[in-house]
Amino acid sequence: MLPFVQEQIGAFIVNFFILSVVCAVTLVVCLAILTAIRLCVQCVSGCHTLVFLPAVHIYNTGRAAYVKFQESHPPYPPEDWV
């Protein structure tokens, strides 16, 4: 085999190896980013379920009780009592 053919084959093998490593690193970085995004979505969902929904329920219950209290006044005494 001629020497320049061996150099071309060697260069091809090295380039293929470098390309494979770059693809693997890119794949790992993309997976890490997607995993981090998924973790953030799960944290936000948990926060929504554990913090905001009970707070909204308590707020709505308190508001309903306040409105009910405001609408149900005891009757005024007759005017001849004054």
Swiss-Prot record:
It is found in: Host Golgi apparatus membrane. GO terms for cellular component: host cell Golgi membrane; membrane. Residues 38-78 are intravirion. InterPro entries: E_protein_bCoV, E_protein_CoV. Homopentamer. Interacts with membrane protein M in the budding compartment of the host cell, which is located between endoplasmic reticulum and the Golgi complex. Interacts with Nucleoprotein. Plays a central role in virus morphogenesis and assembly. Acts as a viroporin and self-assembles in host membranes forming pentameric protein-lipid pores that allow ion transport. Also plays a role in the induction of apoptosis. This is Envelope small membrane protein. It comes from Bat coronavirus HKU5. The lineage of its organism: Viruses, Riboviria, Orthornavirae, Pisuviricota, Pisoniviricetes. The gene is E.
